Amino acid sequence: MCKCCSTEKDVYLPQLATVEKSRLMNATELYIRLSMDNGQFEYKPGQFVEVSVAGMGEAPISISSSPTKKDGFELVVRKVGNVTNAIHKLKAGDKLGIRGPYGNGCYPTEEAKGKNLIFICGGIGLVPQRSFINYVLDNRDDYGELTVLLGTKCHTQRFFHSELEAWTKRDDIHFLETIDQADDCWEGNVGVVTTLIPKIETELSSAQIFVCGPPIMYKFVLLALEEDKVPHENIYLNLERKMKCGVGKCGHCQMNDKYVCIEGPVFRYSDLGSVPEAI
């Protein structure tokens, strides 16, 4: 059962988890693999958890692993404040608190079966998308063509290096990557992620397209998809920004009549027509 349905008494009560592994992936992103001390944790691609450090507070973090992996779950934490700074100091064996998983707006794992899928990721936006991408790869026969576009500001901000390299070598995924700012260490595509859209081999108008990245990216990705006449109901946007409590109580993530933490964080674009502030 989704923890959004928990009783008022325990909705803010975190459960203990143990850090199984932690690894700094670049200057600001930390990978951690966790296991719940009570052994109970089920989630869907697109959901998130509230991570708490004693005496510091808590922060909403997207789950990056696929639920097909049963040996714990993975997060990627960007260092942006006191709570995330404290998380970056954790080592294997350390404890932290977990609430969740939260979010009723998940990736449509069932509805997308048999369809061609395109993931457009900007920087840290790869983190939640990776959960569904790896779910598809673990259930490859259930889905059609798989395309992943990734744009990063510069090569030093890239992460999951070995995984991205493995994707480039697979014949069941079309992976394209670009960086905004090139240097002598980079030999690949240069430009923003929208410059990769014309390179997509799959028919855009009939594919299911999933977008996640910095807020400025959405406007330009959607304009490009409009030019290719992609139906709005085929586009899904991850709007994880501005979340705080995770249970629709604090109002931080409210957009008009929608709460990102409850109805999202993944929304079908056609459902956001009355919420212009979402983009």
Where are these regions (language model features)?
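Short microdomains enriched in Cys/His and/or Lys/Arg
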Residues: I120, F267-I279
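Ferredoxin-reductase
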Residues: K3-D94, K153-C154
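Local cysteine-cluster metal-coordination motifs and their immediate loop/turn environment
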Residues: K3-S6, I216, E240-P265
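FNR/FR-type flavoprotein reductase catalytic core
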Residues: N82-K244
